[in-house]
Amino acid sequence: MDKELALNFLKEIFEKVPGDQWISIFAIDRTVEPSARASQKILWNRVDELEELVDRLEPLSATHCIWYGIATRRARLEKGRGGAEDCALIPALWLDLDIAGPGHKTAENLPPTMEDTLKLLDEYNPPTDFIVSTGGGVQPYWLLDEPVPVSIVLPDLDNWYYTWQKILKEHGWHLDNVFDPARILRVPGTFNRKTSNAIPVTIV
């Protein structure tokens, strides 16, 4: 695991979020049958404990796919990651764009290559702040000037989806609706272990 990459990324994402907010981590052990409850782990850390959080992720990264919740949670939950009603602040807008290849559930048309996907993003204004390569696509980010309460940003998330759905449709490509506040996204510095060939999750 690239701990420095993971830590620097999370610091950028949550830089303006109050330290007492909670970050949820979801991990799946790819050495265990995915349907088994034992394959799933949920971790919690406060925003002001990012170094500790990354230390906790390091041993998991050898066998797990690891995601984090883009929205902070108001409190640490006893069970599960929670839903929209548990989310507090959104620090950035995001996309989750699959690129054609193995491992995707959809039969819809997807951008054929990384080059095509990056060209599409490059044509959009404002430009991205980060583009994370997930091992099966990309997750671009646009940081907000200030974290926005989920109750306020919900209509904007719907509009964001419709905007990008239209853009991709013009190219003949499909976009999943992955813009719920409780959305989880991959942590750079970890690995996509969906197949036997582990692929580093990096920043383009």
Each model region followed by its residue ranges:
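Catalytic "initiation/cleavage/transfer" segments centered on a nucleophilic residue
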Residues: 171-204
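Flexible loop/turn segments at secondary-structure boundaries
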Residues: 138-139, 194
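Signature for HUH/AEP ssDNA processing cores
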Residues: 1-136, 143-166
